[in-house]
A protein has these predicted regions:
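Active-site beta-loop-alpha junctions of metal-dependent nucleic acid enzymes
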Residues: 18-42
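Short small-residue beta-strand/loop micro-motif enriched in glycine and branched aliphatics
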Residues: 12-18, 74-76, 100-101
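Short catalytic-loop micro-motif centered on adjacent basic/acidic residues
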Residues: 19, 48-51
């Protein structure tokens, strides 16, 4: 089995960080978050990290790291996928449009596929909620208000 951690910008739908590995430990989600922080364009903006109630997000290793990097933590109130709709949508796209629903031969293949999928998703896949723009375009052009989210 392989486990995937994603950090997605809710405004632009851009996958900011990701990590795939054979375990679902706090280090998996922490490394995805580290990648996301490195990829930020707008370091002056506050970050709210929203996740489900998985133990890897609630443990001190992750929560301390996130808070030490100035993030507010938010979790779903119940175990309801509708409370984490952006994450569920991106997971579904990766599974069904990019082939992550099937069993892959090994972790190396999965990592290569994931890197390619994230690149295509961020730079080529247009979203109706982004006025048919790509996540990368929306992330770099935040003056526009899209259908799902607006800047505060």
């Amino acid at each position: 089995h392989a486990y995937l951690a994603l950090v997605t910008d809710a405004y632009s739908k851009k996958i900011m960080g990701y990590k795939i590995d054979t375990n679902m430990k706090a280090t998996l989600v922490k490394e995805a978050l580290q990648m996301a922080l490195k990829n930020r364009l707008y370091s002056h903006q506050n970050i709210i990290h929203h996740s489900d109630r998985g133990i890897q997000y609630c443990c001190p290793e992750f929560s301390d790291y996130a808070q030490n990097n100035g993030m507010l933590l938010s979790t779903t109130q119940k175990y309801d996928p509708y409370e984490n709709a952006v994450a569920e949508r991106v997971n579904g796209i990766l599974k069904y449009e990019f082939g992550f629903i099937k069993t892959l031969p090994n972790l190396g293949v999965a990592k290569k596929m994931l890197k390619q999928a994230v690149n295509i998703y961020n730079n080529n896949r247009r979203h109706y909620s982004l006025d048919m723009k790509t996540p990368e375009f929306a992330h770099r052009n935040q003056q526009h208000e899209y259908k799902s989210y607006s800047l505060n």
